[in-house]
Structure formats: C-alpha cells, structure tokens
C-alpha cells in the first residue's frame, strides 16, 4: 500500500496511515463498507469504518474523523493467519515461514460473551462479557465487532430495516 499526509505527526498519522499500511503488508484488508470493495468479505464496519483498516474521516458516510487504535476481528483473523503460516487464502500467495518460534509458558486468556441471542431488527441492545487471564499478567480489555458483510461499497448509512451488513460500529474498550 501507499499513502501520504501533509502533517505526518500524532495518532492520526501513526494509526490512520502507518499502522494501516503495515496492516496491508500482513494481508489485512479494508473493513469499511463505503468507498471501495476489497473483494475479501472484510467490509464489516458501517460507513467509513472506525478501526485501523477502515477509512475513518476519508469517505462518506463518515463514522468518525480518524481511526481507533485497534484492528477489527476480521483483520486479527487474517493477519494472524498470515503470520502463523506465511500464506493468505484470499490472494493465493505463499511467502513461506521465516521465523524462529519460541515456546512460552503464558496461557492465552479466555473470554465469555454469555448466552447467544437473536436480536430482532431495530431492537436496542447492550452487550456484556467477562475475561480471565490464568497467568494474572495482563490487564484485559475487549470490544465487540460485528462480522456481517454487505455488498460494498454502500453510499448509505445503516438503515433500521436492514437485515444484513454492518449495522453497528465497534468502540474502544
């Protein structure tokens, strides 16, 4: 990827530009539902998006002016898969493995989002969850990401009667 800024300083530059372009180098694709279509079913954020791989503030309908400093679930999934295997399913490109793995004793944290529910259209909702780190070494934070794509690009904001596509945005923990 490539990009530029007349004012390359601060979080808007480091998150919206640097982290975004590094995300592309690890096969993280765009998450915004407006402006363009990646073709990889990653358009899971409404409007211009709000996470690192979105175009917050760049393409209407804008959700916010700059990206929040976190990757969406679809990017964590895809970038993580590429890091582990050196392969990306979407573009059929294999760079091979060039790392030296080191075993660590730290156990992965667990998360519990509670019961599954089907929420009818246009129904307000509030989500809660818990997390636990067996090693007690980390302060855990989390957020909720919707994982429903729509045929992008869309020029409209989410509508109350939509039955598919991104209907809500993630927020920083």
PLM regions with names:
Residues 1-173:
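Extracellular (secreted or membrane-anchored) zinc-dependent metallopeptidases
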């Amino acid at each position: 990827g490539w990009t530029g800024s007349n004012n390359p300083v601060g979080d808007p530059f480091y998150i919206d530009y640097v982290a975004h372009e590094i995300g592309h180098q690890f096969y993280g694709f765009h998450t915004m539902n407006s402006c363009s279509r990646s073709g990889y079913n990653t358009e899971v954020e409404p409007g211009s998006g709000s996470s690192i791989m979105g175009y917050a503030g760049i393409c209407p309908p804008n959700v916010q002016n700059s990206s929040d400093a976190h990757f969406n679930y679809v990017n964590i999934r895809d970038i993580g898969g590429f890091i582990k295997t050196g392969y990306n399913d979407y573009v059929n490109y294999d760079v091979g493995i060039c790392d030296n793995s080191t075993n660590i004793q730290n156990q992965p944290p667990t998360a519990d989002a509670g019961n599954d529910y089907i929420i009818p259209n246009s129904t307000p909702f509030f989500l809660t969850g818990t997390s636990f780190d067996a090693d007690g070494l980390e302060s855990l934070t989390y957020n909720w990401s919707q994982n429903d794509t729509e045929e992008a690009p869309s020029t409209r904001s989410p509508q109350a009667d939509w039955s598919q596509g991104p209907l809500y945005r993630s927020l920083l923990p």
